Amino acid sequence: RANMAPFLMAACTLVDRTGRHIQGGHYKEAIEPVELPEQTLTYNGKIDRPRLSKKALSKAEIESLARGYGGCTSELRSEVIGAWDFHANITTNIASTYIVDTTSNHLNGFIINLPCRGMTGYNWTADEMVFHHKPEEYGAIHFHDDDIDDARWEVDFTYEVPDLIKSGVYAARLRINGEDSSETEDFVPFVIKPPKGKTTSKLLFVLPSNSYMAYSNDNLGTNSVVAQLLAGKVPVMSASDLYLNEHREYGLSTYSQHSDGSGVAISSRLRPILNMRPKYRHWLSPSLWQLNADLHLTDWLEEKNLDFDVVTDEDLHIEGVDMLNRYGCVLTGSHPEYSSEKMLAAYESYQLNGGRWIYLGSDGFYWVSEYHPDNPNIIEVRKGEAGTRAWTANPGEYNNAFDGKYGGMWRARGRIPSKVCGLTFTAYGFDVSSYYRREPDSKRPECSWIFEGVGDDEVIGDFGLVGGGAAGLELDRYDLEFGTPHNAYLLARSENHTNLMLQVNEEIHFSVRGYYGGGTENPMVRADMIYYKTPNDGALFAPGSLSWCGSLSYNNYNNNVSKILENAIRGFLKEGPLP
């Protein structure tokens, strides 16, 4: 169009001006605000080395331009308006949203909504699998019509937190005409942190916000062909699920596929996340998941008058072990599956420094998930060639654009979860949960204090709000060969799981009939509760189950799951060496 509208690739201009702008954060090269047009006919697929010329070019001229603008004849260069080489600003990463025009016109631009960079180009030879080792073969950007980095909504209200409000998980309640219904009411959750650099409690809860972002607006219940098989029942859809099924413009989760079938690797919290709401019930119903499940823990902490501070994964990534070191005891949520490299380093250092850590989930510290270096509201997850996963990245595209390092499982980078938290992800199944029985180590003098008030032969956790038991959904095991510390005590072990509870596929090398089986046959299908001491009077306690916290409130909070966790926390908060 012969006007002042911007030149778009992978889309067409519908309206020249929208009043929405990009600047700052991951658009740091935008020195002044850049107004965006409203676009249509957005493109799905890769684009590599686009060129714009004043005339139609011959085959030989096109091939010459593809090899590089600088190597063209002066006559051909004079005909070229723009020659964008998407690999031109690859360094050790390609997190930049800036695209470079290599001509003297310098018609540089920006990518909008963070399509995937570091992707194999038209000339990829497969000689290198890492984009920054041979950047000229990684000149493609993969565009999707459902990419989103920021909804760019206007701010409707702000809230200045009064000093008297304690740290915790809160929500802004929004209603239409004061009505309470799923159609007229919404809750927007947020965290109030302690004052920067300070604590208001000896106990810290790290909200696994990375995992919330990874699962944000997931549509497995409506899109996945295995949803019913995973759950052993027909998924129960909420109003939010049905709405998201019709409105894909809110963006997808890293368990989703783009409309062209490729996996979703980038997730942002700068948009409405309808399944991260306190009243949302996951399609795995009657189970809760992520934020909703973690509210079982905060509810229990308040019931037990255990004061606690709350921070997020993002805070841990930014502040590191210095933040953890301010606390006598640190708790995880029920499903801290997604971790950055800095988060793992902080947890490992905290334990070595004498920190006392309680890992309250399963499938923790499993996937590499890195923050955008210029905007921590956005994470990237490349699902590699192994792991229990919803999709697999294409060959040559396993490395993160955001940091240039190998994506996928932390195990594939030599950081198996058991080296961090003593346990490794072993099984998953979403029909019903089970229970634990005590092991001999639980009666040793070093460990018996954790079970004060619990009988020697008492069944532990055969009740609960998540699948009906404390051992369910996803399970972790004690395994010395996989990195569980040799000084770890095996306190309890789950049993009686169904055949829908299956061993994780990264440990299955050959599919052999009758060898692996489900919970009634496979000894690897179990949750192991462990405890061990770390240097400088530190320690770790972990029950090894995702559904554990769902059992805390049973019988008006008077039950053996509640007693065990309360004993562990109060014991960890005491000054001096542990028994």
Language model features: what each stretch is:
Residues 114-149, 179-323, 576-577:
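Aromatic-Pro/Gly-enriched surface loop or interdomain linker
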Residues 146-147, 158-160, 164-166, 177, ...:
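Helical hinge/lid and interdomain linker segments adjacent to catalytic or ligand-binding clefts
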Residues 204, 328-333, 540-542:
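Structural motif
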Residues 14-15, 91, 197, 209-213, ...:
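Solvent-exposed loop/turn segments at secondary-structure junctions
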Residues 168-174:
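Short, aromatic- and glycine-rich surface loops/edge beta-strands on solvent-exposed regions
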Residues 1, 66-67, 100-101, 219-223, ...:
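Short secondary-structure boundary/capping segments
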Residues 1-117:
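Extracellular glycan-associated modules
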Residues 374-562, 571-572:
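Glycine-rich, aromatic-lined ligand/substrate-binding cores of catalytic
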